[in-house]
Structure formats: structure tokens, C-alpha cells
């Protein structure tokens, strides 16, 4: 794990409790952050998806708008589906809160190197092919991002020398 100083001991709001939000919360807890999770859905609606977070020391603010969770936070990690211009994101930036996406946060904390693939067509094919090429070359390779496996999840146990091949939205 690298660059934990950006998050260790800080109050970090993670917005969106789908796969990438759950993994982001796990990685941030491992980095020593005081994690606050938020989703507009209540815990009952999220159901078993929150199970990976059961034994982690985090604060839950579920079933309420993210705008109501901004006071006292140092940083905010948003899920890939949250637009940069969402009102609560703009408000957080206005308040001086460090706002980043799950992908950037995972890169900052995970050991290893990243190759990011973006574009209009062919991203999934390219990412999958590169993953196989690097694996066959003997590299420990994680195919992550919009391909369905969160970078944060792979980053939990990453080692120096690991390679992340990441599909990124255009």
C-alpha cells in the first residue's frame, strides 16, 4: 500500500454503495481513514451487499442524500456513476473538500502499476487482451475498472510489481 498519508486519519465520505463503493470503503479502512459510507438507499434496500463492510470501523449514513453528509469531511470518493457536476460534488469542492473518484483513489493507495484504456469502441476487448498478454509474460495482472471488477477490490491485496489493466470511461 502506498500514499496512505492522503487518507490516513482523515474523514472520508464514500458516496454510492454498489461494488466500487463497497471496495473503496474497504481499501480506505485499510489505509487508516475514518470512513463514512453514504447511499440514497437505506440499509434494508442495499441488503446483503453491505456484508463485506460488517466488521469494519466505519460510519453509516444510508438512506439520505449525500448533500446532508458533507459537514466535517476531509475528502470524498465518488463512485463511477456519480457525475462530476452533481450538486453535492460541486458543494463539497466549494467547501474545500478533496473530491476524487474510486479509480483515482485506488491508484493512489494500491501498490503496483496501472495501464488505463479509454476510447469510444474496443475498450473491453483491449483491456482483456492486454490482461492476458501481461499474465502470459509472467506479470501478476488485475483487469479492473468498468469491466466489472473494481480497482479498489484488486488493490486490497496488491503487491509491488502487480499490474492493473484498467478500463476507463471515455
Model-derived features with residue positions:
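N-terminal leader/targeting and accessory segments in enzymes
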Residues: 1-101
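Phosphate-binding loop of NTP-binding sites
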Residues: 68-71, 80-170
Amino acid at each position: 500500500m502506498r500514499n496512505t498519508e492522503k487518507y490516513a486519519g482523515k474523514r472520508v465520505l464514500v458516496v454510492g454503495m454498489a461494488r466500487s463503493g463497497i471496495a473503496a470503503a474497504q481499501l480506505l479502512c485499510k489505509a487508516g481513514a475514518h470512513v463514512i459510507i453514504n447511499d440514497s438507499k437505506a440499509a434494508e434496500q442495499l441488503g446483503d451487499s453491505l456484508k463485506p463492510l460488517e466488521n469494519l470501523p466505519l460510519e453509516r449514513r444510508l438512506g439520505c442524500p449525500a448533500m446532508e453528509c458533507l459537514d466535517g469531511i476531509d475528502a470524498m470518493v465518488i463512485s463511477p456513476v456519480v457525475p462530476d457536476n452533481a450538486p453535492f460534488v460541486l458543494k463539497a469542492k466549494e467547501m474545500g473538500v478533496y473530491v476524487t473518484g474510486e479509480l483515482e483513489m485506488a491508484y493512489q493507495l494500491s501498490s503496483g502499476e496501472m495501464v488505463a484504456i479509454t476510447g469510444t469502441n474496443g475498450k473491453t476487448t483491449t483491456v482483456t487482451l492486454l490482461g492476458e498478454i501481461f499474465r502470459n509474460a509472467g506479470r501478476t495482472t488485475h483487469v479492473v475498472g468498468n469491466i466489472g471488477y473494481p480497482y479498489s477490490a484488486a488493490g486490497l491485496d496488491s503487491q509491488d510489481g502487480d499490474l492493473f489493466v484498467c478500463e476507463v470511461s471515455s
